[in-house]
Amino acid sequence: MIVFISLFTLFLTLLSILTNNVIVWWSIFLLMTVVFILLNKSSKSYTSIFNYFVIQESLGLLFLLCSGGLLQFFIILLKIGVAPLHFWIFNVTNNIFNYGLMWFLTFQKLPFLTILLQIFWLSSVYILLFGLLICYVQIFVMKSYKNLLIISSTESFNWIVLGVFFSMFNTFYLFIYYFVLMVLLISKFSKTSGYNFINWETTLVFLNIPFSVSFFVKIFSLSEIFKYDSFFTLFLLFTMFLSVLAFSFWLINLSMKNNEETSNNNKMNYFIIFPLMVISII
């Protein structure tokens, strides 16, 4: 089923690129909501399904009513959950686990991203950069492991959105690679796994260590954004220090405790991840 849904999502993404009809776009929004419901129905995440359905369909109707103009652009940003319009995400992710969470943070956003590209407003770069600043402040005050990962994923997706307007090919390549990484990391967020996701691999990846996927997302985006506004982007780089302090919360727990039962991981998967990080430079 997951293979069929993945292929169906790729088909909807291709369809959204080939057409600029608002009715077709709205139909894609509706079908992606159905996909989300199908994926999370088996885990009985009814609260998250209800919240997601109400939010997405309300915004979908507004998208139809407000045909043309900047309002449609902001509605798409809100539907995707791009910072600083990501405040509703936690109402959905609280009861989502395992691959449902992975799908929500990655592939679920792919058709929306291609539609956003077609109605992009150039001055929104400043809004996206401000959203990154909000993410860094939120990461600094977060104390939940799961919320830390969700905010970090939202922040990385903001960099992807910024990058797609400058280099679409590089961004889609990084998005697919980011998706593969999240498949291996977020699969630990299950109801029965406890804190298995608290490990050195997860922490180091989200600390933006060199050759990690989030590191490349930021480097490729920064190389283009510096041409647009160097001062504000440089200021953002200094504020990234807040995220390092926040993820040190993980580092302290990992250093002070020897949780052998919570350090189990798919070790072979990580032997695959890190060589791929180096290959992605090429």
Curated annotation (Swiss-Prot):
One of its GO terms (molecular function) is NADH dehydrogenase (ubiquinone) activity. It comes from Caenorhabditis elegans. The lineage of its organism: Eukaryota, Metazoa, Ecdysozoa, Nematoda, Chromadorea. It is a multi-pass membrane protein. GO terms for cellular component: mitochondrial inner membrane; respiratory chain complex I. Coiled coil: none annotated. This is NADH-ubiquinone oxidoreductase chain 2. It catalyses: a ubiquinone + NADH + 5 H(+)(in) = a ubiquinol + NAD(+) + 4 H(+)(out). It comes from the Eukaryota. Changing F112Y: In strain: CB4855. One of its GO terms (biological process) is mitochondrial electron transport, NADH to ubiquinone. Its EC number is 7.1.1.2. The chain crosses the membrane at residues 17-37, 58-78, 87-107, 115-135, 166-186, 202-222, 232-252. Core subunit of the mitochondrial membrane respiratory chain NADH dehydrogenase (Complex I) that is believed to belong to the minimal assembly required for catalysis. Complex I functions in the transfer of electrons from NADH to the respiratory chain. The immediate electron acceptor for the enzyme is believed to be ubiquinone. Belongs to the complex I subunit 2 family. Its main location: mitochondrion.
